[in-house]
Design a protein with these regions (language model features):
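Polytopic transmembrane helical bundles with strong interfacial aromatic enrichment
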Residues: 1-257
Length: 257
């Protein structure tokens, strides 16, 4: 496929241009096998008619592939000085990095949870939003309790994720924070609002394709955005405050990660 050809080319260029060994390993032994397995799982999804295991696994591999590509691109831009230089560590950098990393993990969990909602046909377990069939608290039916539980969990995690992203945005406003982290936190805040509204539209429109597809797309955008915030905040936390780091990207020691 085109994607596989591009990844093989990327792995070749990473080796030919003398990129760090970590980048070479990620491209050759990470991305290429992941995409191969993704293609195989895609066939399995069709063969067993969208079973929840294959659907969720297919999405998880796609998100991991997207995550590795995001890391390779962000790292290349940083090393080549084609983006805003990572500033030296500031007060609270390590804590900010932990918040960003935890938020990115929660985005991944929420995406997989959403695929389970789809796989178990739980998208309309409750047909109103923001209420649960007109009630403030969900009322569970013993026959459909598992599907209803998935639906409720997906909603609650969405609210928790929104709160974490807002907390990241507030924390990123502190002096000395990497401006890229500030911008990505602001973008993630906007994306999570759009994502929740699309989730509501899915229920109001009874899972029409014109809202379901954008819901998945915005989720992938949110995943990528949070990964950039997590990578950049980690690189800043790992940076050493020396005269060289202030000299710019051409002279600053690069973080090992």
């Amino acid at each position: 496929s085109v994607v596989m050809a591009l990844l093989v080319w990327l792995a070749y260029e990473a080796r030919r241009s003398g990129q760090p060994r970590k980048v070479q390993r990620v491209t050759l032994w990470g991305l290429v096998p992941l995409v191969s397995l993704q293609a195989l799982l895609g066939a399995v999804v069709v063969w067993i008619k969208l079973h929840w295991v294959s659907v969720s696994s297919h999405l998880a591999l796609a998100l991991l592939t997207l995550g590795l590509v995001t890391w390779v691109v962000a790292d290349a831009l940083r090393r080549e000085g084609l983006t805003t230089p990572v500033p030296a560590a500031a007060d609270g950098s390590a804590r900010l990095a932990r918040v960003a990393r935890a938020t990115a993990v929660l985005v991944f969990v929420q995406m997989i949870l959403g695929s389970l909602v789809t796989g178990f046909d739980a998208g309309m377990a409750y047909s109103t939003f923001p209420s649960f069939n007109g009630d403030v608290l969900p009322d569970f039916d013993a026959t459909y309790a598992f599907r209803q539980g998935l639906h409720v969990a997906h909603r609650l995690v969405a609210y928790g994720l929104a709160a974490m992203i807002v907390a990241l945005l507030v924390r990123s406003r502190r002096s000395g924070t990497d401006p890229v982290v500030r911008r990505t936190a602001a973008l993630a805040t906007a994306l999570v609002v759009v994502q929740i509204m699309l989730g509501a539209a899915n229920i109001w429109g009874r899972l029409q394709a014109d809202t379901v597809v954008p819901h998945m797309l915005v989720g992938a955008m949110l995943w990528t955005t949070m990964l950039v915030a997590a990578f950049r905040s980690r690189w800043q936390a790992d940076a050493v405050t020396t005269p060289q780091t202030a000299a710019g990207p051409d002279h600053a020691p690069l973080a090992a990660r």
